[in-house]
């Protein structure tokens, strides 16, 4: 079975969609563990589905390197085929990215390369663009700079608020993430081809 470790920082709505998909015997992957950088609400989803969890708060470590080492060890302990950043709001340390190169994907609420970073929805509204969307991309050492795997566009309705737009994008992200993971697990999408 194709195995996943997911990393989160918040409520875990994308994680929940992935866990629900993996709960089906027809889905070709399983979430082996969920890690967080804080006591995130999304950990409850993992516990509900009987998935093991770990929390590693960077502030509780004497150095970033020590945190990075334990994060990498905690991920590798579960021997995942894929690491999914499902709302993980921290830049992965370069040592982690290098050790897991070609095996980490992220979901981002914009059409990258437009609006990278933590405030993509706010930035899209401030820029006055008519279209935004969601991107699944391979993680590299930059911030939202890795090769794009899949993008889905969303027209921005006039007068929409930031929370409303974020909610629309989240619905697209859930479906997009579940489908991309399915394609990777089934071998229909080869991540190594994106790193060439």
Name these PLM-found stretches.
Residues 32, 81, 102:
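Conserved acidic residues
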Residues 1-41:
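N-terminal Rossmann-like dinucleotide-binding module
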Residues 36, 60, 64, 78-94:
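N-terminal glycine-rich "phosphate-gripper" loop used for MgATP/nucleotide binding
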Residues 54-59, 107:
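Short beta->alpha connector loops at strand-helix junctions that form conserved
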Residues 49-50, 100:
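Short, structured coil segments at secondary-structure junctions
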Residues 69-78:
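Short, well-structured alpha-helical segments in soluble
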Residues 21, 86-195:
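Donor/substrate-binding cores of folate-linked one-carbon enzymes
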